[in-house]
């Protein structure tokens, strides 16, 4: 039976039917099945932990890093693709996306994880070079990588996801460039989420508290950290579970959110007795 002109017009103007995904219905180890995910800074710490978790959940993952030898070693260990990338070199990002598309066959999700903190102890210790290094890696690079990736995420995915790894320092009073970059990321996430919701792309950030990684210098075997409300640092595996949920189809209504994972530490900072 031929469709009437009215039905054809209605198909064009009506939104597609909603697919409700219940997380309990998704098979264990398949919550990200078939998703093609880029994880920047995937050679250690939280990036490596997330990449492994995504692979374990059925995703086709590509990690990036600057140390090619380490990058290939980690990729081999967790069973994913790898491409060298220095986010500070924004002129290489278009070529990187082209190479990633060849390896993955498309892009469904981008995880902007790579970052650097110089942990300056005082304002007078912040240098021009150090400031620029943190801005380039933590903000400028992810900004333009997302710009290059979004058209492909929109084109190739039923529900695209972009996830930024922010920090609790983006929600606190601080002079350090690292915190400034994370505050900017939080603003960017909300702006992009509003702009791209019409294209069925969800954009969020995870804002972890102090986590046991090489960046913080905390050993996973000794998580004691008295400045967190629960007296300990967090494991990268804990943050990776949140990331897995946010990339899964069960989180399709969540966008423009900064998911803070620090046991209400930053809430406590604003709490008045």
List each model region and its residues.
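C-terminal substrate-recognition "lid" of short-chain dehydrogenase/reductases
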Residues: 235-261, 266-267
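Short, small/polar-rich loop/turn modules that mediate ligand/substrate recognition or access, typified
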Residues: 197, 202, 254-256
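Conserved glycine-rich cofactor-binding loop
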Residues: 43-44
């Amino acid at each position: 039976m031929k469709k009437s002109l009215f039905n054809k017009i209605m198909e064009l103007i009506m939104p597609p039917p909603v697919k409700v995904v219940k997380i309990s219905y998704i098979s264990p180890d398949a919550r990200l099945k078939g998703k093609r995910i880029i994880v920047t800074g995937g050679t250690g710490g939280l990036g490596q932990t997330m990449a492994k978790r995504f692979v374990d959940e059925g995703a086709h993952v590509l990690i990036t890093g600057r140390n090619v030898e380490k990058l290939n070693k980690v990729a081999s260990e967790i069973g994913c693709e790898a491409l060298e990338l220095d986010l500070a070199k924004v002129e290489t990002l278009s070529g990187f996306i082209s190479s990633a598309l060849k390896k993955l066959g498309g892009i469904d999700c981008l995880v902007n994880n790579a970052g650097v903190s110089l942990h300056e102890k005082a304002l007078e210790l912040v240098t021009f070079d150090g400031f620029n290094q943190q801005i380039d890696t933590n903000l400028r690079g992810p900004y333009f990588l997302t710009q290059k990736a979004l058209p492909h995420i929109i084109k190739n995915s039923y529900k695209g996801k972009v996830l930024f790894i922010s920090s609790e320092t983006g929600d606190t009073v601080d002079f350090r460039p690292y915190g400034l970059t994370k505050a900017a990321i939080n603003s960017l996430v909300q702006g992009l989420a509003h702009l791209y919701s019409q294209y069925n792309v969800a954009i969020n950030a995870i804002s972890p508290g102090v986590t046991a990684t090489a960046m913080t210098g905390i050993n996973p075997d000794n998580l004691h950290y008295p400045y967190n409300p629960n007296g300990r640092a967090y494991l990268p595996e804990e943050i990776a579970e949140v990331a897995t949920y946010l990339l899964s189809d069960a989180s399709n209504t969540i966008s423009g959110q900064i998911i803070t994972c620090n046991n209400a530490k930053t809430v406590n900072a604003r709490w008045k007795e």
